[in-house]
Design a protein with these regions (language model features):
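Alpha-to-beta junction loops
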Residues: 15, 47-49, 132-141, 156
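Solvent-exposed coil/turn segments that connect beta secondary-structure elements
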Residues: 1-2, 15, 46, 54-58, ...
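Ligand-site clamp/hinge motif
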Residues: 1, 104-149, 164, 177
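Ligand-binding "clamshell"
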Residues: 148-160
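Surface-exposed binding/hinge segments that line
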Residues: 10, 31-74
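Aromatic- and charge-enriched surface segment that lines or borders ligand/interaction sites
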Residues: 1-28, 50, 130
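Gly/Pro-rich hinge or "lid" segments in bacterial periplasmic/extracellular proteins
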Residues: 57, 62-117, 123-125
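Alpha-helical secondary-structure segments
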Residues: 11-18, 50, 84-85, 112-115, ...
């Protein structure tokens, strides 16, 4: 099973409580607008949740995997306890977060580092310089205009990773030839 950072086993009750939190009027969750089509949530045993939607939604698998939707222990939506590979040690908004490896992480072969420090560097040039100078070990959201500069540096590895982002192509199907 999947364990929370506090050792509690995650159950369908936790999933339902978390989604209800994200859908709540007062939650402030960035995901609340994504979940408006959820009509009800029902536990079907300890490890299964049934989502009833207002109507069919082909994007629903993408919606429920949105990074804003964190699953927390029922009754504890604010402490930061989760199920991820790293446990939050400190958080200074807009400055940095420090995380340590979760020794009970449920995905084997992951969470390789003992500790991770996430530093907020807003300025793109400062971020690029920090990577080039070895002040940071990794960065995301590389500016495509400067990616070739990084590719020329033998000490920098560019990783292109597939995500859940997708593009739609809306078409008006009510007129010919459709």
């Amino acid at each position: 099973g999947v364990e929370f950072h506090n050792g509690k086993t995650m159950t369908s009750e936790d999933v339902i409580a978390s989604y209800n939190h994200h859908m709540g009027e007062d939650s402030g969750s960035a995901a609340s607008g994504l979940l408006t089509a959820v009509k009800s949530l029902t536990a079907d045993g300890k490890n299964r949740v049934i989502f009833e939607l207002e109507s069919a939604n082909a994007d629903f698998p993408f919606i429920v995997s949105d990074y804003h939707i964190s699953i927390r222990p029922a009754g504890d939506m604010t402490s930061g306890v989760g199920t991820g590979g790293y446990i939050l040690q400190s958080f200074d908004p807009g400055v940095k977060s420090v995380l340590k490896r979760n020794p009970n992480y449920w995905k084997e072969g992951r969470a390789h580092f003992d500790e991770v420090e996430l530093i907020s560097i807003i300025d793109p040039t400062a971020r690029q310089n920090a990577l080039m100078n070895g002040e940071i070990d990794a960065m995301d959201r590389v500016d495509l205009k400067t990616i070739n500069l990084f590719k020329r540096n033998p000490d920098i590895n560019i990783m292109d990773i597939t995500g859940t982002a997708h593009y739609t192509f809306p078409m008006r199907l009510s007129v010919d030839p459709f």
